[in-house]
């Protein structure tokens, strides 16, 4: 996830009472509020479950930010209505936004890393091994180097 703006060039420019859009689905809402805490815009309840953070967990909001939680996929189309928006990499990609224009990015949380999983009885199936082989192939590594553009976190063994 990253912070983007059509109005400001820095996260340091945040005005008092800024309007900020964040995703309204539970996992991405939590990710974005954690990112906004990381950049110093808010403070969150230290006892809150990091995977389930909501607006109710904000304990300090020194910039008096007005948050609007909305469908992630609609955020890019409404950027002009907000001072800043917080959006995930997949939404950035789908909207054709240049990921390098992010003013801030989240720290990757280990529990959010996506994985391909199969039932135990399928782990040695030819199709499952084909996925593993493709994922670890030089072609995939090269493709990700060329096409990642900062949108996705890539494990070190694939870089």
Regions found by a protein language model. Give the residues of each.
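Ligand-binding cleft/hinge of the Venus flytrap
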Residues: 13, 31-68
